[in-house]
Amino acid sequence: MVPSRYLYLVRHGEADDDDALTGAGRLQASAAGERLRYTRFSAIRHSPMQRAEETADLIADFLPGVPVGASGLLGDYLPPVSGPPDLPPPYAGLLGSYTPEERSEGAELASAAIQRYARPGGQDDSELIVTHNFLIGWFVRHALDAPDWRWMGLNQCNGGITVILYRTGMPASLVSYNDIGHLPPALRWTGFPAEIVPPPR
């Protein structure tokens, strides 16, 4: 039997301008914790950013005994982009807002994050990561063998849950993507580009 390693990726809750969770963000984090409370995790890892740490701590309240720790590999940075020269203007504008040094550092961190976390394990395992929109898109892009720039446009809602399965000798499987079914309607779609939010029924 091939061991199954599940990587759960949660985007932090909604945050204010000071990087602290808003009231809605705290509710989103708690709802994610409630949703995940029956999953047996080996560890919870999170970005060093305050909004991710607060989210991880609130989720951990539902997962007693699971070790929690920060990793600089899971921070809020720009993953690599070496795509076509004719990127859509919004994407090109995003790249222009980062210095060459920031882009180089982000590429190194993103590569290291994949090597550390996006891999099969020697036994059945589930690990939870609380991180940011860009990096979750980067993990999904990697799982699907898409071009490295294609994390752009893969957006996550605050409190959304994405799950990727890794097994030795097999391609990664995207089990679920941006699951927000655990969030009440008023807490869904925050942090998501307004122009692509599905219209209400």
What are these regions (language model features)?
Residues L7, Q123-F134:
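Generic beta-sheet signal
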Residues V2-S71, S97-R103:
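Active-site-proximal alpha-helix that buttresses catalytic centers in soluble enzyme cores
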Residues L58, W138-H142:
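Active-site signature of alpha/beta-hydrolase-fold catalytic machinery across serine-
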Residues Y38-R40, Y117-D125:
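Glycine-rich phosphate-binding loop signature in dinucleotide/nucleotide-binding domains
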Residues D17-D19, I59-Y117, R201:
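Phosphate-handling substructures
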Residues G13, N133, I180:
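Active-site metal-binding loops of divalent metal-dependent hydrolases
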Residues M1-S4, G65, G69, D76-P88, ...:
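Acidic, low-complexity terminal tails and accessory targeting/binding regions
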